[in-house]
Amino acid sequence: MKRTPHLLAIQSHVVFGHAGNSAAVFPMQRIGVNAWPLNTVQFSNHTQYGQWAGEVLAPAQIPALVEGISNIGELGHCDAVLSGYLGSAEQGRAILAGVERIKAVNPKALYLCDPVMGHPEKGCIVPPEVSEFLLDEAAATADILCPNQLELDSFCGRRAQSLEDCVNMARSLLQRGPQVVLVKHLAYPGRAEEHFEMLLVTAEHSWHLRRPLLAFPRQPVGVGDLTSGLFLARVLLGDSWVQAFEFTAAAVHEVLLETQACASYELQLVRAQDRIAHPRVRFEAQLLAL
């Protein structure tokens, strides 16, 4: 029997709706990966509603929980760590210590950092200390880095002006340590407005992918969290980088189609679960000569 991969997902959680682990854990489990959620914040709902209740996890709890998993002999079974939204830079450093601990017992374990800072259309949503931590410390530790356009621009200290510029900027991030950079959402000047564009860059190659941009009265939250989670899960299941890239684009599009059909502000993950596992659409990533 083929072994089920395990990953530790360290990011935000909402009680109602889907963001952070609430957007990523179920889809990862649905496609065959055992996700262990460790929630950096627990809020009633995502913050785009304008009001919420809840609290940030004390940073000391992260190593304590990792230690608890170690004490029952399970830490060595962890194949990857995923980190997303951080409530503080101190939380981030606790996560990196956890990554180091896991890699000490499983050197093959991967670390995917989703450097959540904000959205190209909404601006930065995290304190400066978190941005600085992501730029200066997290990127150097990550095996897989998954910024959006705002975050790519922040890492490189300037705004991208073209697709080629985005490729060069992503490639420059590889020099900090990651094996691969997945840009979840491109928003460079002159792009086709009717498409949603993504980029995958390794040291040897770069791939560009387009899917139709679906219209919503209010854009659903959690799409980036879903994207990062599915990409990492597919890699753990044995996909190549580009196979995971194409699967992720298709599965996320299926969720958005279901969400649009339901006229919902929240991602319709439960209704779309079979479409996540077996996407009916397919998008082919184009190898770029750049």
From Swiss-Prot:
Pfam families found in the cross-reference section: Phos_pyr_kin
Keywords: ATP-binding, Kinase, Magnesium, Nucleotide-binding, Transferase
Recorded GO CC terms: cytosol
CDD domains, A to Z: pyridoxal_pyridoxamine_kinase
The enzyme's E.C. designation: 2.7.1.35
Cofactor: Mg(2+)
GO biological process, one term: pyridoxal 5'-phosphate salvage
EC class name: transferase
Positions annotated to bind ATP: 114, 151, 184, 211-214
Molecular function GO terms recorded: ATP binding; magnesium ion binding; pyridoxal kinase activity
Family classification: Belongs to the pyridoxine kinase family. PdxY subfamily.
Name used for this protein in its record: Pyridoxal kinase PdxY
